[in-house]
């Protein structure tokens, strides 16, 4: 009964050993947001090797846009899978509860179409709704993305790609990390996670 979790752990270890290039060999249905970031790293590295031709720069913007769309599709797909798993577990518990009720002596319980039997003593009983699960997964993916960007910034500092600058409240340092025009306002869209990772990881190859 414990074999499936072990197999999943072995697969994760193999994926880690494969490195960023391993994401390109995955099935589209198995991709995660982290795989999309690995793909952005590989593509950025390949583009840097082509030089600074204007056509390469134009191609880079198109690739970034495609990766952003892929990230959105992957996140939505992962949420759908988690929702289906939760619904499957709920249905299993409902069937088990109906079987117990049917075999036990006593009056028959008539459940409605949107009702399910939950054993309050079961430590594995469902405790969250599908919407709550969706919110948690979205927050988790957002935090993972932010962590990746922070790690890339730290690596750039350590390697000297981004020299720290003195300024009140670290304002100049933020401008070095995320340059903006002097007339930029609050309505201007900031870089997405994909764009940040693409630029940081590409910069390492220079």
Swiss-Prot record:
Chief location bin: cytoplasm
Origin: domain of life: Eukaryota
Region spans: Disordered: 1-29, 161-189
Subcellular location(s) of the protein: Cytoplasm, Cytosol; Cytoplasm, Cytoskeleton, Microtubule organizing center, Centrosome; Cell projection, Cilium
RH2 domain ranges (all copies): 125-197
This protein's record includes keyword Cell division: no
Keyword set, alphabetical order: Cell projection, Cilium, Coiled coil, Cytoplasm, Cytoskeleton, Protein transport, Transport
Gene Ontology molecular function: dynein light intermediate chain binding; protein dimerization activity; small GTPase binding
Pfam entry (one): RILP
Keyword Cytoplasm part of the UniProt annotation: yes
GO BP: cilium assembly; epithelial cell morphogenesis; protein transport from ciliary membrane to plasma membrane
GO-annotated cellular components: centrosome; ciliary basal body; cilium; cytoplasm; cytosol; membrane
Subunit structure: Homodimer. Interacts with RAC1. Interacts (via N-terminus) with MYO5A, the interaction is required for its role in dendrite formation. Interacts with RAB8A; interaction is dependent on the phosphorylation of RAB8A on 'Thr-72'. Interacts with RAB10 and RAB12; interaction is dependent on the phosphorylation of 'Thr-73' on RAB10 and 'Ser-105' on RAB12.
Function: Involved in cell shape and neuronal morphogenesis, positively regulating the establishment and maintenance of dendritic spines. Plays a role in cellular protein transport, including protein transport away from primary cilia. May function via activation of RAC1 and PAK1.
PANTHER family associated with the record: RILP-LIKE PROTEIN 2, ZINC FINGER PROTEIN DZIP1
Family: Belongs to the RILPL family.
Protein name, per record: RILP-like protein 2
Organism of origin: Bos taurus (Bovine)
Organism classification: Eukaryota, Metazoa, Chordata, Craniata, Vertebrata
């Amino acid at each position: 009964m414990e074999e499936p979790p072990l197999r999943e752990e072995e697969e994760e270890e193999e994926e880690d050993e494969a490195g960023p290039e391993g994401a390109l060999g995955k099935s589209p249905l198995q991709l995660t947001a982290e795989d999309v970031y690995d793909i952005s790293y590989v593509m950025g590295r390949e583009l840097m090797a082509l030089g600074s031709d204007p056509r390469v720069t134009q191609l880079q913007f198109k690739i970034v846009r495609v990766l952003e769309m892929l990230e959105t599709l992957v996140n939505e797909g992962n949420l759908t899978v988690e929702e289906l798993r939760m619904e499957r577990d709920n249905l299993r518990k409902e069937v088990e509860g109906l079987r117990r009720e049917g075999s036990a002596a006593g009056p028959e319980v008539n459940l409605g179409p949107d009702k399910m039997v939950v054993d309050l003593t079961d430590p594995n009983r469902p405790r969250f709704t599908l919407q709550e699960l969706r919110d948690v997964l979205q927050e988790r993916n957002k935090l993972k993305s932010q962590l990746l960007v922070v790690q890339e910034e730290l690596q750039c500092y350590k390697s000297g790609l981004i020299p720290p600058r003195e300024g009140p409240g670290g304002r100049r340092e933020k401008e070095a990390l995320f340059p903006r025009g002097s007339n930029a306002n609050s309505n201007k869209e900031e870089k997405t996670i994909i764009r940040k990772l693409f630029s940081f990881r590409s910069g390492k190859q220079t």
